[in-house]
Every structure is written in structure tokens, then in C-alpha cells.
Amino acid sequence: MEYKKIMIAFEEHDQDNKVLSAAIDVAQRYNAELTLLHINERGAGYPSPVDGHIEHRYTEEELSEVVTKVNTKNYPVTILLAKASGVGDAVIEHSKACDLLVLGHRHMSFLAASTSDSMDEEIVNQLQCHALIIPIT
């Protein structure tokens, strides 16, 4: 399979640098278009009514800084910043425009894994394109 359009679902820049780096390597190997997708959930930037936690609302400039820091090969990366109420559904919708979706996978505890799928598993179960899963420690 030859990939022409690759998308990375980018969540948290500290942990996803490894995922971004892998996506750049694959895109370069196939000379493919690379798009970094980040979904700001609708409540991002505002305190949660439950616990007061404020989820960070990323800007295109912040994501561009992350790409510049990780992208030592200066491979062209398009940044797509979207807002949605559900991250999984938004990633699935945007992934319809690509051949390969690159995702990070965080280990879940036994209890969490036995009661539900991780976000990346939920996404992969509904994808219409190939997926590359990068383990994040």
C-alpha cells in the first residue's frame, strides 16, 4: 500500500511528540501529505462544572511550535485545528480524507481496560482507512 495522505490525531504535545515523529518518518518515506489534527473539545478553556478542571484549549500557533520542535527534517505538516463535542467522532470524520491515521496509545489499567475501550480503540473500530498505533509510555 502506498500512502498519499497521512493524518496524525494529536492529543497532548508532551506525550505525542513520539507519535508526531513517527508520522513524519512514515510521511517522508511515502512522500505523503501530512496533516496534524487536534480536536479542542467544546468545553476546553473553561472550568468543568464537576471538578473545576480546565482542559487546555490549543491554538494553531502552539501546535505549530510543537511541530517545529519535533520536525527536525523540516517535512511539510499542515495543521488542522477543530472544535467538537466528541473527540472520537471528530477524528473518525476527519480521517475519511486520509489513507493512514497515526494514533498514540496509552496503557490503561486492568480495571479501566476491562470496563471500556481506550479512545484509540474506539476510533480504530470505526475507521475506514489504515491505522498506525504508536505506544506511549
Regions found by a protein language model. Give the residues of each.
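Structural beta-alpha unit
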Residues: 1, 71-101
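Small/aliphatic-rich secondary-structure junction motif
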Residues: 1-50, 78, 126
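Active-site phosphate/pyrophosphate- and oxyanion-stabilizing loops and adjacent acidic/basic residues
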Residues: 24, 89, 121
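Generic structural signal for helix capping and beta-alpha/helix-loop junctions
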Residues: 44, 87, 110-112
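Short, flexible/disordered intra-domain loops and linkers
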Residues: 46-55, 112
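Short, surface-exposed alpha-helical segments at coil->helix boundaries
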Residues: 53-64
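Gly/Ser-rich helix-loop-strand patches that form or flank binding pockets
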Residues: 97-137
